[in-house]
């Protein structure tokens, strides 16, 4: 995935997903990408 930093956390983008996977934390919505930013960033 692509690295992202939304809010106070860093993570990776999950494109075209309305929400993060259950084992991932939600950092925030980045308007300039079609996806959500989820942690951890691996």
Swiss-Prot record:
Where is this protein localized, as stated in its record? Secreted; Nematocyst
The UniProt keywords, alphabetically, are: Disulfide bond, Ion channel impairing toxin, Nematocyst, Neurotoxin, Pharmaceutical, Potassium channel impairing toxin, Proton-gated sodium channel impairing toxin, Secreted, Toxin, Voltage-gated potassium channel impairing toxin, Voltage-gated sodium channel impairing toxin
Residues at the site labelled Important in ability to inhibit Kv11.1/KCNH2/ERG1: 8, 18
Q: Tell me which SUPFAM superfamilies the record gives.
A: Defensin-like (SSF57392)
Q: Which GO terms describe its cellular component?
A: extracellular region; nematocyst
Q: What does this protein do?
A: This toxin potently blocks acid-sensing ion channel ASIC3 homotrimers and heterotrimers containing ASIC3 (composed with isoforms of ASIC1 and ASIC2). It also weakly inhibits potassium channels, and sodium channels. On homomeric ASIC3, this protein shows IC(50)=57-87 nM on rat, 37.3 nM on mouse and 175 nM on human channels. The blockade is rapid and reversible. On heterotrimeric forms, the toxin is less potent (IC(50)=117 nM on rat ASIC2b-ASIC3 channel, 900 nM on rat ASIC1b-ASIC3, and 2 uM on rat ASIC1a-ASIC3).
Give the family from UniProt.
Answer: Belongs to the sea anemone type 3 (BDS) potassium channel toxin family.
Would you tell me the protein name for this molecule? Pi-actitoxin-Ael2b
Natural source organism: Anthopleura elegantissima (Green aggregating anemone)
């Amino acid at each position: 995935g692509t690295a992202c930093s939304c809010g106070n956390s860093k993570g990776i983008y999950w494109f075209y997903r309305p929400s993060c996977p259950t084992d991932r934390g939600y950092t925030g919505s980045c308007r300039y990408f079609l996806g959500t930013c989820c942690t951890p960033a691996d």
